[in-house]
């Protein structure tokens, strides 16, 4: 909200299921979830949610995000691996003419349900813009078993969260001041 209101130029966020990308798309911002290990998570942080939770940015433009990536990317202390650097930088790459891309656009949900007409038109307008820039654009809808995806996502998040909690608590039970009432029941 602060970026969309013009209070700040960028904001940090972590994204494991859309926490950066979804708010950005609702506010007219650019939300970016980079490749794993592109940005540091903090000393010895490892991976949140088995690598699905990734630190990223919300900005007003691709250019702002590229500048932030140049400023922030790199390994951190104790990182199990690191994404290789781009070379001459993300901001510099923006000024390079892009190669012709093959782009699939989807103006429905994964299950084929219609989306809001204004959103569908925005998707098609983006496709027309990409075509005008010389890219090949075609309709596409990934085939996805959405219930199975959600089950797998929930399992990964649950296990990742449990491992994170276990790493902090060790073998002791949580104290009442550490867990909300509902959480205490779930813990049992």
Model segments located where?
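Residue-level signal for short, function-critical loop segments
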Residues: 109
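Gly/Ser-rich catalytic/binding loops embedded in alpha/beta enzyme cores
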Residues: 1-17, 106, 122-128, 133-134, ...
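Short glycine/serine-rich loop segments
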Residues: 1-76
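Short low-complexity, flexible loop/linker segments enriched in glycine and/or proline
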Residues: 25-28, 151-158
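Positions that flank functional sites
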Residues: 17-18, 144-146
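Generic alpha-helical structural signal
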Residues: 66, 124, 150, 159-162
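Short helix-loop capping/hinge segments that flank enzyme active sites or metal/cofactor-binding pockets
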Residues: 92-106, 156-188
